[in-house]
Amino acid sequence: ALVQLGQKDLLIDCQGNWGNILTGDGAAAPRYIEARLSKFALEVVFNPKTTNWKPSYDGRNREPITLPIKFPLLLAQGVEGIAVGLASKILPHNFNELIDACIAHLKHEDFVLYPDFPTGGMIDVSKYCDGMRGGNVKIRAKIEKDNNNRALKITEIPFGRTTSSLIDSIITVSYTHLRA
């Protein structure tokens, strides 16, 4: 869980090999990685002015009772999981766009908010349904022509894919078309 939070670059300051979401490389063993809460996390999530605290189990430290977060962190980070038979998938969103949407909401203004992915890519939101159940998005790699139009350069990959899985799918498609 800590590695996944650390790879999202918002709550955890990381040091060591935390893996790579682009290549799918895993993180090093826990003894080789270090983590601390980021300044953002200390201000927005663990702020002593907005968080209620209680003594820890042995009374030497304090721990938060609840985490009243001043920012829609769930939308920024995104989440996917299942518990007690209920599946959930919330796509990540752009930090700055979330701030603008929060301000618009507080001013009772309309706003539009679409998912934004850390790996980039081109997104089709024509069937998004404003994030409601049944909606979906399609994400494609961003490809540019290079070397006098003789080569293709993939500059952004779809969210949830790794470079190796993208290469494998390109090889599979190319073999299929070469045989035809």
What function would you assign to each model-found segment?
Residues 1-136:
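Catalytic phosphate-handling regions of large nucleic-acid enzymes and associated NTPases
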Residues 19, 140-144, 155:
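Residues in well-ordered beta-strands of folded domains
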Residues 49-53, 147-152:
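Gly-rich Lys/Arg/Thr-decorated short loops/hinges at beta-loop-alpha junctions or inter-strand turns
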Residues 86-88, 143, 156-159:
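Flexible glycine-/small-residue-rich
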Residues 133-144, 150:
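Fungal transcription factor middle regulatory core
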Residues 151, 155-175:
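Long hydrophobic segments that form regular secondary structure
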Residues 176-180:
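Conserved small/polar residues in nucleotide/adenosyl-binding loops
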